[in-house]
Amino acid sequence: MPIIQFGEKDLLRGKVVLPAWYRMRIDEIGEAPSKDGGSTNYPVAGTILHNADDGSTDFAGVPIDWNFNSKAIGFAVGFLEAFGVKAEAGKRFDLNSAVGKELDVYVENGEYQGRIVNRVNHKYRAPR
C-alpha cells in the first residue's frame, strides 16, 4: 500500500497569494541545463516571511519558485542589486551567496495550464 506524507511546504505550495511585495528568504538556487540544452536555468526557491509593506503574515510559509536563464540573465540584475551588489559587465557573481538572505519580491498572479499561480516577474527591492 503506497503511503505518503506531506510537509508544511507541500500543503502551502499551491496556495495563491494576493499580488504584493513580500519579504522572502532565499532557500535554494540551483543550476541545470535547459530542456533543449541551449542554455542554463537557475531555479530559485524562496519562502514568504510576511507582506513587506504592512507586515501581514497571512501568506507566511508559502514557497515561491522562479527562474533565471542564461539567455536572459539581465533579469538577475535587480535581484543582485536588492542585495547591494552592483552588476558589472565581465564580472562573475555567485548566485548561491543569496541563499539564506532576505529581500523583497513582488509576487503577481498569472495563469499556467488553465490555473491561477503565483508568479515572480523580476521585481526586487532591498528590505525596508
Q: What do these predicted ranges mean?
A:
Residues 1-128:
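Short beta-rich binding modules
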